[in-house]
């Protein structure tokens, strides 16, 4: 399975999360996953909620349109983005 997969109602992303980074960014490929750096620490779900907020801004969707399908408690996650309004260039390059 690739890092970015199109499905009928949006995109499925396989992510590797780097918490406690200096800034929020989509770093690029990390093996067969997309590496995302976020500033939040991995404590009490702070990293997950920060990740959802960050992805919501990047894809211009509401937070309710982003679902963590797998990896709620780990660094390796599978996230579904329902009907993205915009696709960031870092992700668009991987879908081709």
Curated annotation (Swiss-Prot):
Stretches that traverse the bilayer: none
Gene3D superfamilies: YggU-like
Top-level taxonomic group: Bacteria
Family according to the record: Belongs to the UPF0235 family.
Organism: Salmonella newport (strain SL254)
A single Gene Ontology CC term: cytoplasm
Official protein name in the record: UPF0235 protein YggU
């Amino acid at each position: 399975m690739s890092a970015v997969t199109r499905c009928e109602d949006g995109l499925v992303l396989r992510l590797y999360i780097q918490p406690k980074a200096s800034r929020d960014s989509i770093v690029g490929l990390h093996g067969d996953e997309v590496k995302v750096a976020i500033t939040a620490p991995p404590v009490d779900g702070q990293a997950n909620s920060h990740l959802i907020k960050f992805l919501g801004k990047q894809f211009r969707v509401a937070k309710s349109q982003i679902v963590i399908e797998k990896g709620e408690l780990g660094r390796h996650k599978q996230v579904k983005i329902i009907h993205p309004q915009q696709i960031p260039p870092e992700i668009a390059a991987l879908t081709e």
